[in-house]
Structure formats: structure tokens, C-alpha cells
Amino acid sequence: MKKGLLGAAAFFLATALLTSCGSKKVPSYNELDVEQYVTLGDYYNLGLTLEIESQIKQLMQNVYHSGMPAEDGFTGRPVELGDGVDIDYEGKKDGVAFAGGTAQGAFLSIGSGQFIDGFEDGLVGVMPGETVDLDLTFPVWYDNSDLAGQAVVFTVTVNYILPEEQDMKDSVVEGMGMDEINTVAALREDVFDYLYYYSSELEFAQDDVLMALLDICTFAEELPQDFVDEARKMFRTDLEKQAAYYGMTTEEAAQALGAMSEEEFLKARAEQNVRGNLAMQAVANREGLSVSDDELQELLELSVSSGEFKSVEEFLEYYNFTREQYRNLVMVDKVLKFLLYLQDTI
């Protein structure tokens, strides 16, 4: 389920110090005594709440469903909104079953919107073991022209309701044969890892968790100047590109971005970037987070296969990274994910 690419906030944060005016002689945060520049606050309690629990539940149940025995399903109450259910169904138009409208032992999360309007709502209140006929109509924009706008009948049997996370069994997860995922807790973490890359809620939350971390940290008045200078170069290059695109001077572009002047813009952006990287590395140091050579190589190869590059070397050259600079970028991503996983979910 793991994607192996990088979250948007991590990429923006790290590349500000990894790419600068074509120079590859860039200092590395993992070689810096960051604790002399930053004092961490209580990052286990950032006060953020992530509205992703329904997504976590749906994905966990979907994966769990593929390996659970039917006798572990619940049958003693009617279906409710938010339940995951195992169903058999057959769809008919004018009394004739249509292609793609029949399945046995299918997983469905009630309320997910996976099926056409009325299908999932029609199962709310149905007891496991019961069969119902649902008179429905396909939307006019449905991609199958033979069914678009047509009235159909789905005959659906609810077989059982899937267990909630607290009722899932480690033995079932272990029996699925997934590498390094042998417990329910590990399954949840893997699902969260997947959502980190694909959920819009978590994408937006990356910025929130970074700002919350900066708010509870204390920074030295004097930041490491080499790092500030490198960040400043990158932001100047970026500002020049934006100014050229919009036909502005760099001073005008900086003011359009809310700064009083170009100098103010570059100073503020560079120093904020350095503070963010210092805090991230400090968390990594305290938590023992690292990126091994094997992990780095695997992620580089995934990045190559996901793009239009023929080799790791071509990928690194395109983004002007050394392997160690890319390792630093992956570390920022890992810390962001770690911090998000600590937050409350609803």
C-alpha cells in the first residue's frame, strides 16, 4: 500500500535547502548540532484533530475483508450508516441481468458513495441474512450508455457486518501474508501511510502540523548562516521565475506576495524554512528516525519508475540532488508523517 513518493509539504520544505542555483555543495541538517539552535516543545500534543477516521475505517475494513472468515462477521443487528458490509447483489434491467451488475461476497462501506444513489441508503436497517429489492435509476451521465438514465432493480443480500477496528483480530491480519503487517495496529499504520499520499485532508494537514510544530519550539536568535544563505538563494531564484512569468520586477512580485519589499520577503521565507528544517531534524534525532541505504535506494527507484526517468542518476541530475540531499528530503517526509500519526482523528 505504500507509495514511496513524497508529500507536498515535505518536498517544498526540504527542496528549499536542497536545490540552490545549481550548487551541490549544500550543508546537511543531519550533520548539524541542531539542538543548539532549537528547543523542542511537546510535539506529542500539537492540538490538531484530523478528520480522516472514516477513511481509515473504510480502508482497514476493505483490506481486512479480503482475509477474514465469514463467521467473524456480525449478524445480530441491522445495518447502519458507516458500516462495512459483505453483500451479494444482482442488477436487472427489464428483468434481465446486465453485465457488471452481479457480485458475491463484495465489500461495501455504507455511505461511501461507491454505488449509485439509493443503493447504500436502501441497505440501512436491513438485517444480515435478509434480501431486499432496490428500485433504482442510473444517472443520465453514467458511462455505460445502455444503462444511463435507465430504471433497474438490484436484488441485494446482506451477508454480514464487518467488525470495527477494536474487534479485528491480529491472527487474521497475520494470515494475509502482507510483509511487515502482522497486527491490526500495523494495518492501521499502513493505511495511514497510504492516506498520507492520497488523502486531501492529510495533504492540507501537513502544513498545519509544520506550523503547529514551529509554534511550540523555541529557536536561537542567530540561525546557522550557511543554511539561511542557501535557502535565500533558492527563494530568490523562485521569485525571479515568478516575476518573469507575470512580467514584473522581483520587487513587485514580492509585494504581490504580501511582503513590504523583496529583501523582507527573502529574509522571512529563508529564516522560516531553516526553522522548519531545524525542528524536523531535532524530532528525527530524538525519535531515532533515519533513512537507511536500502530504504533510500528503494525510494529512488520508485521515484524513477513513477516518472519519465531512465535511471536514478538521471532523476537526481534533473532535480539537482545528491543521494544524501535526497535522503534529507525523505527524512523530512518521514518526520511529517510521524507527527501526523500522533494527532487525534475523528
For each predicted feature, which ranges?
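FKBP-type peptidyl-prolyl cis-trans isomerases
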Residues: C21-I346
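Sec-dependent bacterial lipoprotein signal peptides
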Residues: M1-T19
